[in-house]
Structures are given as C-alpha cells and as structure tokens.
A protein has these predicted regions:
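Expand to "…catalyze enediolate/carbanion chemistry for C-C bond making/breaking, isomerization
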Residues: 1-134
C-alpha cells in the first residue's frame, strides 16, 4: 500500500474550525496519513493597490493553528509547503520588514503567485523550529 499525504489549505481563520474535524474523520477510518500544511494558497488576497499578495501574519497564523490542531488531536504535522525565494522581493505583506500594500510595487517580480522573501522565509523557519520543540 502506498503513502497518502493530505495537504491542508484552509486559510488562517478556518484551520481550528475544520482541521480537527478532518483529523477525527481520517482517524476513524483507520488511515495512516502524512499531514502537510499549505499556508500559502488559502491566504491569498488582492491588495488595495491591486496586487495579488499574502499577508505574512495570515501565513504564520495558519502554520501555528495547524500545529495547535494536530497537538490537540494527538497527530503530527509532517510537512509544510511554502512558496519562497532567496531574493529581496516585495510580494507578501508583513514580516519584520513591515512590507505594506504601497511597498508591493517596489520589487514585485513573481510570474505567478506571491512568494515569501528571504527575510520572511527565515522568520517562518524560526517559527516552525519553535513549534517542533514543543
């Protein structure tokens, strides 16, 4: 039998409402799955300046809420999916650089979806490391 990976992408506001229910259903069926969180796609919005973006605090919240939901249900988050670049782009708002809607046009280089920049990616890596230590 092969492996099954379930990639969740609820959006930061919906994780705690829906993920625990999904976990319970999967467990009741006796399925052994790998859980992966995609906090990018469920948190894409159109900025007031017209750019497709992702608020960093929403991405962060979805990751944190996913860890919380898995802990409460006795399961483990086995993976995360991020869209990122090592370049200093301004495609996602927020983070320690405090990128706002007006900053998006400065270095918006994506050919498709907005990516976390190097600073935001590192900030997120530290969050994941903190969650894994719990």
């Amino acid at each position: 039998m092969g492996r099954l990976t379930l990639i969740t992408r609820f959006g930061h506001n919906n994780v705690l409402d829906y993920l625990p229910k999904l976990i319970k259903i999967v467990q009741s069926e006796g399925l052994n799955v790998v859980w992966c969180c995609d906090p990018m796609h469920g948190n894409t919005v159109k900025s007031t300046s017209g750019f497709k973006t992702r608020p960093f605090d929403h991405v962060l919240a979805e990751v944190q809420n996913s860890f919380t939901a898995h802990r409460s249900e006795g399961t483990y988050l086995g993976g995360v999916h991020f869209e990122m670049t090592g370049k200093d782009v301004t495609e996602c708002t927020g983070g320690l650089q405090l990128i706002d809607d007006e900053d998006l046009s400065l270095r918006y280089h994506t050919a498709c979806d907005p990516r976390l920049n190097a600073s935001q990616s590192l900030e997120l890596a530290f969050l994941v490391a903190e969650q894994l230590e719990k």
